Amino acid sequence: IVRYISYSLGQGDAEKLRRVFSTSVIIQCIFALVVVLLVESLGLWFLHSRMNIPEGRMDAAGWVLQCSAGVLVLNLLSIPYNACITAHEDMSAYAWISLLEGTLKLLVALGLYFSPSDKLKTYALLMLAVALVVRLCYAAYCRRHFEETRGRISFDRSMVREMSGFAGWNFLGSGADLVNTQGVNLLSN
């Protein structure tokens, strides 16, 4: 996505830049929908039938699965905004938002120490809240500073086809790497 946004910036075509951003939002929404469908079908099946979870902790494991899926969806939806910041080379914004994210995660860790409720559920919910705050910060910053992020989302079929092909291969490569690194943990469980 950064590649397409950077190329459009270089061309100086504001309308094409807006279409590229809009298309990237649509593509990420489609990916997010696929993730939700996979988690709600295969993820729940795997959790309930294949995972070795102690008695009485299945409820907490379900919370973690749902909150983790929420974090993943929020992160997917942040990608076009992160790409705009990177393409515009506004690294100070990226640094400040990352600093906020790190601080919030530190507060989550400290808050767990004082939490009277189930720490696993609390952790999952607080990490979802952190992801939501970070997502809103990226969106607010981009909408304020970058013209292409304002306005309505429009659908350009040819651009969706072109960008989703590239993004799909990138997503497949990242997914294979994730399965490679995390698959050992699943198999050992």
Question: Model regions: which residues?
Answer:
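Alpha-helical transmembrane segments of multi-pass membrane transport and lipid-handling proteins
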Residues: 23-52, 111, 136
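Helix-loop junctions and terminal segments of transmembrane helices
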Residues: 1-11, 87, 146-147
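Alpha-helical transmembrane segments of multi-pass membrane proteins
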Residues: 41-44, 54-78, 99, 125, ...
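Membrane-interface helix-loop junctions in multi-pass transport and translocation proteins
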Residues: 92, 103-136, 140, 144
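Interfacial transmembrane-helix starts/ends
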Residues: 14-30, 164
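Membrane-interface junctions at transmembrane-helix termini in multi-pass inner-membrane proteins
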Residues: 73-98, 121, 142
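Interhelical loop/hinge segments that connect adjacent transmembrane helices in multipass membrane
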Residues: 120-126, 138-185
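Helix-terminus/linker motif at the lipid-water interface of multi-pass membrane proteins
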Residues: 48-52, 111-116, 178-189
